[in-house]
C-alpha cells in the first residue's frame, strides 16, 4: 500500500489486490481491473465511486519504457460528422452567457470568478468546449479544497478529542487569484480542436471496423506504443487533481485547473518529464517555472481532458439547435470496438476498506513515532 499526501492537503492511497488496482483520494476513488483484449490491445475497466454514485470507464493499456500506462477510451462514439462539426467554426459567433451555463450563484464560480472569464461569444464549438472543460476542472478544484479542509478539521478534532460536530465543512478561502491569460486559453482550445479532429478519424475507423472487421489493419500492441501523454503533438495539459512536482529541487503543488506545457518527450530515470507552468493559482507552483512531472500524473491529466471532451460533446449534442446555437448535422452514436463494461459494485466496499487500512497504518506510525525511542534505531 502506497500512501501519499499532497502539499495542500488530501491523501491518495494506492494498492493492488487480487489483480485489481485500488485508488482512493479525497472521498472517492476507483477500482481498475483487466477487462478484454482486442487486436493485441489490452483494455481495463475503471469503476469510480463517490457520493453513493458509480460510473465506469474503459482504459487502454500502454506498456512503454518498462512502465504501464492507461489511456481513456470512449465506449460509445458519435458519428464522424459530429466531431467534424465540433472543430470547425460556426457561421456567426454564438452568445452563451452565465445564465445559459447555469453557473450563477455557484460557490465555485464565485471563488474562481477573478481567475477565469468565459468567452463573451463562441466562434466555434471547440471554444464552447474549452470553457466547459475549464469549468469542470475548477469545480473539481473547489470540491477538493473543501474536502481537504474538512478532513483537516476532522483530524484536528480527533487529535484534540473533540467530536467536531459543530464545525461542519469549511469552504475554501480565496487567496489572491491570478488570471488565466487569453494565450493560455487559446492553447487549451487548440488542444481541444486537435482532439476533435483526431476523434473524427477514429470514429470513422470504428464504423469501418464494424462494417468490415476482417479488413482492418493489425494494430500496435500494448508493448510498443507510447501513451497519449507523450504524443509529441500533445503539449498543453490541464491539471486534473492535486499533484506534487519538483522545481529547482524543491517540491511545489499544482491543483485542478492549473495549466502546464510539456517540454520534453522522453522520461528520465525517475519517469519524469519537464514541463513549464503556464497558468497557476495563488499558492501553487509559480507561473513560468520548469517542473519535473511524473508521466503517470501527466497521463491522468490527459485522461480527464479526454473524458471531459466526451462529456462535453454529450452536452453539445443536447444543446445544439437551442439558445441560438446552430444545429449539428448528425448527433447519432455508434458502438466502439470495446463495449462499455458494467460497474464493479464491490468497488465501494473495497475503497472503504482501503481507507480504513490507511487510517490504521497512519495511526500506528504516529503512535510509534510518539512512543519513547520512537523513530530511533
What are these regions (language model features)?
Residues 2-176:
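Low-complexity segments
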Residues 21-23, 42-43, 246, 281-286:
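Short, surface-exposed beta-strand/loop "edge" segments at domain boundaries and coil↔beta transitions
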Residues 177-243, 265-267, 271, 287-289, ...:
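SH3-family beta-barrel domains
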Residues 227-228, 248-254:
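Short, surface-exposed secondary-structure edge patches
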Residues 251-265:
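Conserved beta-strand/loop element in small beta-rich adapter and peptidoglycan-binding domains
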Residues 256-259, 274, 329:
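C-terminal assembly and membrane-engagement modules of membrane-active proteins
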Residues 271-280:
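SH3/SH3-like beta-barrel fold
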Residues 283-295:
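Mid-chain, structured segments of secreted extracytoplasmic proteins
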